[in-house]
């Protein structure tokens, strides 16, 4: 049986959401000389890259470092969290990016890892917030908040430079 698939955000919609999120980050961090943008692998990292590019364009005097955080999304406690490149977090401000916030388990585990690195401040970004929390975490900046049933699935597809969000 074929899955029903509804387009929630097309590429143009996603680009507008990313631009708005980048603008909100710029408003918050325009005075800072350095900012770490950490994307949760794989889609969160690709979104973080797009956000970092826009932030760097509008804050040319700031150093924007893009990092990829790898975590087992199905079972975050099963494997160690890794980060690349392995830059110092010490007393720095961090933006943590993921594609979808559902139960909060992955974002919570990633945030816990980053907080353990003696950072100065952290904000969280997600493209889609489903509002099905099992853990006490929130996204500071959200592209789209969507109420879904537990049985429905949000799929963020990134093909080359084209990003779309589907409800399945």
Where are these regions (language model features)?
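PRPP-associated nucleotide enzymes
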Residues: 1-168
């Amino acid at each position: 049986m074929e899955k029903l698939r509804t387009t929630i955000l097309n590429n143009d919609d996603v680009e507008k959401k990313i631009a708005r999120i980048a603008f909100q980050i710029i408003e918050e961090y325009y005075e800072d000389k350095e900012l770490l943008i950490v994307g949760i692998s794989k889609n969160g990292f690709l979104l973080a890259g797009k956000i970092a590019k826009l932030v760097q364009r509008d804050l040319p005097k700031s150093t924007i470092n893009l990092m990829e955080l790898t975590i087992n999304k199905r079972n975050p406690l099963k494997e160690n969290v890794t980060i690349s490149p392995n830059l110092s977090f010490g007393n720095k401000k961090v933006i943590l990016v993921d594609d979808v916030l559902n139960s909060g388990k992955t974002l919570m585990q990633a945030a816990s890892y980053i907080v353990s690195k003696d950072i100065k401040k952290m904000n969280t970004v997600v493209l889609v917030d489903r509002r099905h929390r099992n853990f006490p975490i929130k996204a500071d900046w959200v592209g789209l908040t969507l109420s879904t049933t537990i049985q429905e699935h949000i799929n963020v597809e990134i093909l080359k430079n084209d990003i779309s969000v589907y409800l399945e």
